[in-house]
Amino acid sequence: MNFTSNQLRDFSTLFSRSEVNRWLKGDFNSIDIKLERYNLIEKNKGNSYLKFLRNTYHILEKNYPNEYVLKNEFLNKWLKKELGTNNSAIFNEFRIGKAIADLAMFNGISKVFEIKTILDKEYRLSNQIQEYRKIFNEVYIIVPDVLLTKYSNYDESIGIITFDSNSKNFKIVQRAKRNKELNPETLMEVLHTKEYLEITEEYYE
């Protein structure tokens, strides 16, 4: 079955944090809406919501490089191996002031990762990086390899990681320069007390 870019974009909204929270509460209304919208009710008759979500994920994986798919590939197959350890603490959608980082990793050195797919605009990136520098030692952006030239001269202090069209292969093109001038007040504001204690006890004592 062929899907338009609008349909794929619509499917990708199923994997946002807010939607996952709704599933955990037993609310699957958004899935029902999409099944009806794209005449998929009969095709999925007898299937569980979980099976539909798995099938949808595979469709997105092959056809639509959205952030959810990239995060899974990046986390599961690359990040800890290349830039962390098995004991690294990783947080998804980590809020810093008005910005929300795609991924944050703590393992003695704090690192933040901002994903920019081929569908994303860069107009917010400058402000995001400014916020990230307040509490992270290293800032990385993850971009499609076809857009490397566009981002390569963006900021020489940030690291650049590229991924291919299949969202499978990641490569460090430029390592981030270490930032030691952190803002302790901002750090205390953005971390929940429990998270802060766990991180400091595990990595900074």
Region spans (language model):
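Interdomain/boundary linker segments immediately adjacent to catalytic/signaling cores
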Residues: M1-P65
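Conserved catalytic cores of phosphodiester-cleaving nucleases, focusing on short active-site segments
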Residues: L103-M105, I109-L119
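Short acidic-glycine loop/turn motifs at beta-strand connectors
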Residues: N107-I109, D164-S167
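A conserved mid-domain beta-alpha-beta active-site/ligand-binding segment of alpha/beta enzyme cores
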Residues: K168-E205
